[in-house]
């Protein structure tokens, strides 16, 4: 047995007699020849032994105490032809017929045999007592190592798995998608990708309606319900649900924090505990140095005045730079609109497809994106989180608050480049630019009139197409014109004005209307020669022109002073002498039309209108008040004129 230093390692190709080249990459450990069972502590000596040509000699009967323990699971079941088992009190001998293996600590690398003849391998194990002291020692497994420098990939699933891994380095992608043309190095990746086109999501969550195309996405989703955060930072209490979030978080720590605070011991300890511990990522020394370098790397925008910073790599910075360069590589297939980011294009495509997946549970509103739905929900909750610090104003979104703050600062950032007009919001500027362009985009749906602004179109429709007579082709300018014209088609108005086409249902209303045609202007001003037909016009004149003079002479406001002849109060006093009382409830009125409106409330007495009116002759006393007992049906009540007229 040859012994040498244990600190060396080997990585390279080994030429075995017979023309077979085998890649070997092993860590320093005990190496056992699969033919003669000779042991080597040095890998170079073991390779030299294999190159010199191994023959089955007497060295195969080595001492049991120096032979590494190999369990029965070491030999694959498919390769075993005959197995004999002899159990003694000290040792256990297993004789198998199998290809040649190289056994090492926890690994086995398959080496092809030099001839087609089956070789008989005798494996001698340690005593049973010594094996019972280490029940946790895992059985040795057959593993293949990647030959590319720096790659630590190892597999125990044979050469096929190794070949799939090597496609990562070679870039070979033989599996192509028939729908989009995307290529994959593995067939199972293509199968998972095809679910994006077919929409098949076989992995469903038992807690909610979530469904995923692959099991890994479902496992990540389940951590949301369980609030499991297995990936923990060793520097601070931060914990995340997936490794990518932890990798981004580690960039926030500086190199000094990584060197001082990261513990040297491996977190995956072999000590047995009652409760299982959550896995913690422990970075190797090289990876920690790389992460420390990334932690100090902050990508800043190179444009003057821009303070954008990112720790998410160059891709995030490239997306930001498109704002300055104006590069919009993502173009819509239905319109000419372009976008700088692909996710913005995906959201824009919903405008053409009318897909609105985000629906309100309180009304029928549906939104294209979740942010629009959140803004809509604030209408139901009346939530106004954006508050002005200068006044009590509060808004539902930040854009409304930004526009409101311009009313305090007087800022008008949107200026017309053809004139000196300035505006607070961009929509006002767009409406203003239509004036310069002469464009009239708003067309009337009833005629050929076009307007530059929507407000002008609404005014046109209201004037020209709203106040239209239903019986003829008359078109009024406003509601008053239409009401005046509609009286021509009303045959149930017996009272008609002899001067115009006005008609009404009562004589009192006709008397009020007759003042329009009367040349007499009984209401005269005491301070000037102004006269009018209406008392309200006189009151407005005095209040507007002679307010100071009325205060100087200590005159009471019109309506509270003494009754003078010809005034509106005097006329009301005369009309009061013809009082109209309701027979049903006893209510009294000055005008008969007021009584008629009141009688409509008594639907059971509305048939006989003539019997509803009772006229009482006046009997004025010394004070000018009426105190005559009148009989209304079977009810006797004193009639007192109202003093509020």
From Swiss-Prot:
<feature type="compositionally biased region" description="Basic and acidic residues">
    <location>
        <begin position="600"/>
        <end position="610"/>
    </location>
</feature>
<feature type="zinc finger region" description="C2H2-type 6">
    <location>
        <begin position="358"/>
        <end position="380"/>
    </location>
</feature>
<feature type="region of interest" description="Disordered">
    <location>
        <begin position="543"/>
        <end position="567"/>
    </location>
</feature>
<feature type="zinc finger region" description="C2H2-type 9">
    <location>
        <begin position="442"/>
        <end position="465"/>
    </location>
</feature>
<dbReference type="GO" id="GO:0008270">
    <property type="term" value="F:zinc ion binding"/>
</dbReference>
<feature type="region of interest" description="Disordered">
    <location>
        <begin position="600"/>
        <end position="645"/>
    </location>
</feature>
<keyword id="KW-0479">Metal-binding</keyword>
<feature type="zinc finger region" description="C2H2-type 5">
    <location>
        <begin position="330"/>
        <end position="352"/>
    </location>
</feature>
<keyword id="KW-1017">Isopeptide bond</keyword>
<comment type="similarity">
    <text>Belongs to the krueppel C2H2-type zinc-finger protein family.</text>
</comment>
<dbReference type="GO" id="GO:0003677">
    <property type="term" value="F:DNA binding"/>
</dbReference>
<feature type="compositionally biased region" description="Polar residues">
    <location>
        <begin position="622"/>
        <end position="631"/>
    </location>
</feature>
<feature type="zinc finger region" description="C2H2-type 10">
    <location>
        <begin position="467"/>
        <end position="489"/>
    </location>
</feature>
<feature type="zinc finger region" description="C2H2-type 2">
    <location>
        <begin position="203"/>
        <end position="225"/>
    </location>
</feature>
<keyword id="KW-0862">Zinc</keyword>
<feature type="zinc finger region" description="C2H2-type 11">
    <location>
        <begin position="495"/>
        <end position="517"/>
    </location>
</feature>
<keyword id="KW-0597">Phosphoprotein</keyword>
<keyword id="KW-0238">DNA-binding</keyword>
<keyword id="KW-0805">Transcription regulation</keyword>
<feature type="zinc finger region" description="C2H2-type 7">
    <location>
        <begin position="386"/>
        <end position="408"/>
    </location>
</feature>
<dbReference type="GO" id="GO:0045944">
    <property type="term" value="P:positive regulation of transcription by RNA polymerase II"/>
</dbReference>
<comment type="function">
    <text>May be involved in the regulation of mesenchymal cell differentiation through transactivation of NOTCH1 target genes.</text>
</comment>
<feature type="zinc finger region" description="C2H2-type 1">
    <location>
        <begin position="175"/>
        <end position="197"/>
    </location>
</feature>
<keyword id="KW-0832">Ubl conjugation</keyword>
<dbReference type="InterPro" id="IPR050636">
    <property type="entry name" value="C2H2-ZF_domain-containing"/>
</dbReference>
<feature type="zinc finger region" description="C2H2-type 12">
    <location>
        <begin position="523"/>
        <end position="546"/>
    </location>
</feature>
<dbReference type="Pfam" id="PF00096">
    <property type="entry name" value="zf-C2H2"/>
</dbReference>
<dbReference type="GO" id="GO:0048762">
    <property type="term" value="P:mesenchymal cell differentiation"/>
</dbReference>
<dbReference type="InterPro" id="IPR036236">
    <property type="entry name" value="Znf_C2H2_sf"/>
</dbReference>
<dbReference type="GO" id="GO:0043076">
    <property type="term" value="C:megasporocyte nucleus"/>
</dbReference>
<protein>
    <recommendedName>
        <fullName>Zinc finger protein 64</fullName>
    </recommendedName>
</protein>
<feature type="zinc finger region" description="C2H2-type 4; atypical">
    <location>
        <begin position="299"/>
        <end position="324"/>
    </location>
</feature>
<feature type="zinc finger region" description="C2H2-type 13">
    <location>
        <begin position="580"/>
        <end position="602"/>
    </location>
</feature>
<dbReference type="InterPro" id="IPR013087">
    <property type="entry name" value="Znf_C2H2_type"/>
</dbReference>
<feature type="compositionally biased region" description="Basic and acidic residues">
    <location>
        <begin position="543"/>
        <end position="554"/>
    </location>
</feature>
<dbReference type="GO" id="GO:0005737">
    <property type="term" value="C:cytoplasm"/>
</dbReference>
<keyword id="KW-0677">Repeat</keyword>
<dbReference type="GO" id="GO:0005634">
    <property type="term" value="C:nucleus"/>
</dbReference>
<feature type="zinc finger region" description="C2H2-type 3">
    <location>
        <begin position="231"/>
        <end position="253"/>
    </location>
</feature>
<feature type="zinc finger region" description="C2H2-type 8">
    <location>
        <begin position="414"/>
        <end position="436"/>
    </location>
</feature>
<keyword id="KW-0539">Nucleus</keyword>
<keyword id="KW-0863">Zinc-finger</keyword>
């Amino acid at each position: 047995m040859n012994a040498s230093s244990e600190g060396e390692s080997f990585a390279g190709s080994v030429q075995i007699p017979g023309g077979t080249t085998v890649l070997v990459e092993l860590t320093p450990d005990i190496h056992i020849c699969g033919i003669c069972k000779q042991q080597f502590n040095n890998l170079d000596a073991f390779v030299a032994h294999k190159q010199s040509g191994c023959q089955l000699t007497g060295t195969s009967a080595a001492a049991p105490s120096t032979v590494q323990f190999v369990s029965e699971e070491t030999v694959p079941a498919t390769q075993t032809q005959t197995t004999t088992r002899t159990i003694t009190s000290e040792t256990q001998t297993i004789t198998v017929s199998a290809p040649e293996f190289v056994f090492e600590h926890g690994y086995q690398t398959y080496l092809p045999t030099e001839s087609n003849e089956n070789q008989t391998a005798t494996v001698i194990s340690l005593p049973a007592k010594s094996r019972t002291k280490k029940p946790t020692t895992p059985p040795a497994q057959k593993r293949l190592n990647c030959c590319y420098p720096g790659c630590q990939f190892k597999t125990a699933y044979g050469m096929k798995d190794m070949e799939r891994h090597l496609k990562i380095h070679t870039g070979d992608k033989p599996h192509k998608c028939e729908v989009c043309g995307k290529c994959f190095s593995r067939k199972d990746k293509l199968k998972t990708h095809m679910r994006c086109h077919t929409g098949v999501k076989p992995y469903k969550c038992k807690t909610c309606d979530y469904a995923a195309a692959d099991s890994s996405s479902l496992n990540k989703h389940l951590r949301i319900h369980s609030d499991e955060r297995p990936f923990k930072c060793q520097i601070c209490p931060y914990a995340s649900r997936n490794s990518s979030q932890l990798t981004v978080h580690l960039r926030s720590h500086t190199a000094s924090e990584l060197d001082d605070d990261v513990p040297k011991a491996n977190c995956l300890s072999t000590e047995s505990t009652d409760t299982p511990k959550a896995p913690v990522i422990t970075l190797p020394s090289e990876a920690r140095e790389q992460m420390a370098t990334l932690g100090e790397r902050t990508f800043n925008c190179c444009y003057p005045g821009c303070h954008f910073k990112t720790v998410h790599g160059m891709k995030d910075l490239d997306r930001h730079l498109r704002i300055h360069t104006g590069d919009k590589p993502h173009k819509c297939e239905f319109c000419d609109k372009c976008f700088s980011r692909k996710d913005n294009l995906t959201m824009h495509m919903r405008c053409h497809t009318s897909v609105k997946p985000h629906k309100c549970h309180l009304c029928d509103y549906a939104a294209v994106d979740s942010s629009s739905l959140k803004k809509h929900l604030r209408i139901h909750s009346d939530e106004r989180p954006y508050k002005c610090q200068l006044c009590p104003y509060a808004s539902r979104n930040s854009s409304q608050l930004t526009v409101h703050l311009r009313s305090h600062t007087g800022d008008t950032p949107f200026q017309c480049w053809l004139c000196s007009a300035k505006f607070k919001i961009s929509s006002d500027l767009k409406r203003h630019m239509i004036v310069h362009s002469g464009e009239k985009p708003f067309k009337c749906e009833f005629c050929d009139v076009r307007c530059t602004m929507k407000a002008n179109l609404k005014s046109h429709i209201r004037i020209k197409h709203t106040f239209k007579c239903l019986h003829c082709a008359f078109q009024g300018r406003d509601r008053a014109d239409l009401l005046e014209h509609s009286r021509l088609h009303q045959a149930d108005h017996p009272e008609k004005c002899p001067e115009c086409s006005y008609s009404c249902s009562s004589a009192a209303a006709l008397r009020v209307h007759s003042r329009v045609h009367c040349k007499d202007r009984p209401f005269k001003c005491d301070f000037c020669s102004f006269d009018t037909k209406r008392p309200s016009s006189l009151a407005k004149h005095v209040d507007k022109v002679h307010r100071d003079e009325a205060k100087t002479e200590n005159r009471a406001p019109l309506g509270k002073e003494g009754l003078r002849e010809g005034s509106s109060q005097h006329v009301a006093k005369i009309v009061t002498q013809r009082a109209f009382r309701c027979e049903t409830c006893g209510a009294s009125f000055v005008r008969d039309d007021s009584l008629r409106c009141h009688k409509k409330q008594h639907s059971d007495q509305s048939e006989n209108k003539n019997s509803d009116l009772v006229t009482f002759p006046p009997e004025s006393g010394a004070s000018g008040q009426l105190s005559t007992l009148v009989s209304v049906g079977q009810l006797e009540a004193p009639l007192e004129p109202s003093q509020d007229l």
